[in-house]
């Protein structure tokens, strides 16, 4: 009876280890001074050790000091290849599900900070999951993996986008002031641009710092536009709450001027976001179009400016043609061709 109990305990232990560990990944470890190759199945790794089983199901893994390992050659799992294929085909909705599964499957290696574990697929899965969420507009769902992506072992080439994930987290939380301040860190200071004070360069054309790639620039322009747009809306509420009188005229004019500059800047940035990367980030381009249409209708000159009305009509037709599902019903009036007030004169 005693031996039977021990056997059952041992069997349960093996089963529990197999179930609780991450999905094993086939790999070959090069170990020792003689650089011998040891094939096996990696189940997990921490900052100091890597755990390898001789069995495909990952049972009974043995720990090896990463300090004794000179190289690790990974074999890409089929489910990982399928997830990357979805990414490469721009199928981000399906990709988000695939990378979420990969996050769970390979979580056992994601957090290891050892240099040999840098850019492992467990860490990459968190990154690609966040990117799929971003590209499909699931911004609030990015909050939990955003905490996680900061902990995984990804190299320098991933860090610029990881930093931008913070901006999307601000957007998800409607934190417009922190988002706007964050976007200011990417732009050249106004005092460093000759001509801003003399109207050679308009205040809504503040350029970004050198060295930012176009993929990130598109996101920065959109996030800067969105935060500026929303902050202008907050100022507009303040303006509407001020009593109209001679005593408040100066205050109202000052606020109105600030709102005008901010909305002009936001509109410029929306246009940049949708065009700078040739629309390669389709979701971002569509959102930029939609939000710019909302903004155009708020511009004081829109009601009498036929040129602006024609531009809004053309963009509305384009957006509705590209993705009718994203086109808001409250903008349906823009689908009607505007009438030139000077026609026939």
Predicted region positions:
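Bacterial N-terminal signal peptides that target proteins for export
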Residues: 1-8
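Compositionally biased alpha-helical segments
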Residues: 21-181, 188-241, 247, 251-282, ...
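Short acidic/histidine-centered micro-motifs embedded in hydrophobic/aromatic stretches
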Residues: 3, 291, 334
């Amino acid at each position: 009876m005693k031996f039977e109990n021990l056997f059952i305990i041992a069997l349960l232990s093996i089963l529990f280890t197999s179930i609780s560990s991450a999905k094993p990944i086939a790999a070959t470890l090069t170990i020792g001074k003689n650089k011998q190759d040891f094939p096996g199945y990696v189940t997990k790794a921490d900052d100091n050790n890597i755990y390898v089983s001789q069995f495909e199901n990952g049972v009974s893994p043995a720990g090896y000091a990463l300090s004794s390992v000179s190289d690790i050659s990974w074999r890409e799992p089929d489910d990982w290849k399928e997830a990357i294929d979805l990414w490469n085909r721009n199928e981000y909705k399906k990709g988000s599900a695939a990378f979420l599964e990969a996050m769970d499957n390979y979580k056992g290696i994601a957090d290891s900070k050892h240099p040999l574990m840098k850019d492992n697929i467990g860490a990459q899965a968190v990154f690609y999951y966040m990117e799929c969420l971003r590209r499909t507009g699931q911004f609030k769902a990015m909050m939990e993996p955003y905490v996680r992506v900061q902990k995984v072992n990804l190299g320098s080439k991933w860090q610029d986008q990881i930093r931008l994930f913070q901006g999307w987290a601000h957007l998800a939380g409607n934190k417009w002031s922190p988002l706007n301040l964050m976007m200011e860190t990417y732009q050249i200071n106004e005092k460093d641009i000759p001509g801003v004070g003399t109207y050679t360069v308009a205040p809504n054309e503040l350029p970004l710092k050198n060295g930012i790639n176009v993929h990130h620039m598109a996101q920065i322009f959109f996030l800067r536009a969105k935060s500026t747009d929303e902050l202008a809306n907050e100022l507009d509420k303040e303006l509407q709450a001020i009593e109209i009188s001679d005593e408040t005229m100066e205050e109202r004019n000052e606020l109105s001027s600030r709102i005008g500059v901010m909305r002009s800047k936001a509109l410029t940035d929306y246009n940049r976001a949708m065009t700078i990367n040739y629309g390669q980030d389709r979701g971002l381009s569509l959102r930029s179009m939609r939000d710019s249409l909302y903004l155009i209708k708020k511009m004081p000159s829109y009601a009498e400016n036929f040129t602006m009305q024609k531009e809004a009509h053309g963009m509305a037709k384009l957006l509705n043609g590209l993705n009718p599902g994203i086109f808001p019903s409250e903008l349906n009036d823009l689908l009607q061709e505007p009438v030139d007030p000077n026609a026939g004169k």
